[in-house]
Amino acid sequence: MNNRLKVLRAERDWSQADLADQLGVSRQTVNALETGRYDPSLPLAFRIASTFGLAIEDIFSE
């Protein structure tokens, strides 16, 4: 699954650790999400969308 996490995070000048703390996941999980090695659960996708103030479909695409 493609996503805009890395771009959105960079726009806010957040490190992977910063985003991980906000989402309640590990930095490794953020890295795996950004590189497409891990697809988020629905609850995590909603937390990500809420964190960035965007709709899920504005962040993730197939």
Region roles according to the model:
Residues 1-11:
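A short, Lys/Arg-rich alpha-helix, primarily the initiator
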Residues 6, 17, 46:
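Residues within the helices of the helix-turn-helix
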Residues 10, 21, 50:
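Alpha-helical residues within the helix-turn-helix
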Residues 13-32:
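Short alpha-helical DNA-recognition segment
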Residues 34, 60:
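DNA major-groove recognition helix of helix-turn-helix
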Residues 43-58:
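DNA major-groove recognition helix of helix-turn-helix/homeodomain DNA-binding modules
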